[in-house]
Amino acid sequence: MDKNSLNSQSVKFTYSPPTELVPSLWILDGTWSNFLGRRMTVIRLRNNEVWIHNPMRLHKPELDWLSSLGFIRGLVAPNQWHVSDLLWMAEQFPEAQIVCPQSFLDRHPSLSSRMLFTTDVQHVTPDHELEFLPVPGVRFEETVLFHPLSRTLILCDLMMNLPPAETALRRAFFKLNNMGECCSPTRTLKWLLTNDKKELLHFVSQLAELNPRRIVVNHGEIFEGEGGNQIRTSFALLFG
């Protein structure tokens, strides 16, 4: 059986049913090979074009649901690490364009005709309904999305918001890495994944000015509240 068949065992990880956070914006929470989990976000624009952030392998009912939302316009790989199911989803929606890091294109040149980069995407989303913001100063080629209509910020590894750890060992790890019970950047980001602190913090200050109502992270719980203050405070506490 073809490994990409919708009836095969290619969907290894479980996920929740779609949840509509706000009108025309849905999430699916999924398990992963580690305790961090993952999240797929789906945004439908006013012209019924649909963008999928961090695509996950899905069973046929959820793929049918995606198709029912409108034309699948684009698939967004949030950074160079979260691309495991991008090719699979691209096969299910062959007309969708792909927003991805340069490193992914280098490995898959046959898809170059479908690739979009952040500087080009602004011109294909009507009235900037969805903003694509590449993160400078980091080593993992992340792109953040902002949905102005709902003031929702969608990111991946720039910040985490994990629930309380269940074991003493994990609690110690969370404390060491600044990654539990608070929507914040991790120490891994600060010490290992940042290559230009000044550039990153300037970008972060611009994110804070967007003052999102919610921050949809890939790992952990969705932050609801004064997103601008949370971004400023959490980065200031960690980076100084």
Q: Where do the protein language model's features map onto the residues?
A:
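Short His-Asn-centered micro-motif
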Residues: H53-M56, V76-Q80, C100-Q102, V135, ...
